């Protein structure tokens, strides 16, 4: 059954004019249904030029002398070049580039005092000062034994090591 709308005053043009702003007109330049799909960027356009690279912030004053001499050479080789003629300082780096992979490699000596301080500093950043105190108390005996080269037992709670190849035939 078809719907019929009866108009009270009989003038259909006036009723259409009152609702006309709610409909799109045919004479508008912008046609929503016939728009072309968005074009991808041209292959020659360099997308990285659109992003701004912010400079690396300076480290806090407490981080100034944490790099050992072998690590310093690696850090300088990874450092961005300053084109203004200013010299580069290792203190400008907030952290050694490469993270733990570089620190654990042959480049950085794990027995170096500055390397151990760097580990303690990172531990303080993530776990608080109580964890760093535990780390210092654990590292001190090990470093003393390494430097002396003696075979003194380090702690009572450490189990004795068993030989890897046990040839017991019982």
Curated annotation (Swiss-Prot):
Record bears the keyword Nucleus: yes
Keywords: Nucleus, Phosphoprotein
Entry's localization field: Nucleus
Pfam families hit by this protein: Myc_N
Family annotation (InterPro entries): Myc_transcription_factors, Tscrpt_reg_Myc, Tscrpt_reg_Myc_N
Post-translational modification: Rapidly degraded via the ubiquitin-proteasome pathway.
Organs and tissues of expression: Highly expressed in epididymis. Also expressed in hypothalamus, pituitary, uterus and ovary. Low expression in testis. Not detected in heart.
Entry GO CC: nucleus; spindle
Residues bearing PTM Phosphoserine: 60, 68
Keyword Phosphoprotein in annotation: yes
Main location: nucleus
One function term, GO molecular function aspect: molecular adaptor activity
PANTHER family: MYC PROTO-ONCOGENE
Summary of the function given for this chain in its UniProt record: Seems to act as an inhibitor of cellular proliferation.
Name of the protein in question: Protein B-Myc
Organism placement in taxonomy: Eukaryota, Metazoa, Chordata, Craniata, Vertebrata
């Amino acid at each position: 059954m078809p719907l019929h709308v009866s108009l009270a005053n009989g003038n259909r043009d006036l009723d259409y004019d009152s609702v006309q702003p709610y409909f799109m007109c045919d004479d508008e330049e912008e046609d929503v249904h016939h728009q072309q799909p968005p074009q991808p960027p041209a292959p020659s356009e360099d997308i990285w030029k659109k992003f701004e690279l912010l400079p690396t912030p300076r480290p806090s004053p407490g981080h100034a002398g944490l790099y050992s001499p072998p690590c310093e050479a690696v850090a300088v080789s990874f450092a961005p070049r300053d084109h203004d003629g200013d010299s580069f300082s290792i203190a400008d780096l907030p952290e050694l580039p490469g993270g733990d992979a570089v620190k654990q490699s042959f480049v950085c000596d794990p027995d170096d005092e500055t390397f151990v301080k760097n580990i303690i500093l990172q531990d303080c950043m993530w776990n608080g000062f109580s964890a760093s105190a535990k780390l210092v108390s654990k590292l001190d005996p090990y470093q003393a034994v390494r430097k002396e080269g003696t075979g003194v037992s380090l702690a009572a709670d450490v189990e004795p090591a068993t030989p890897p190849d046990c040839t017991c035939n019982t």
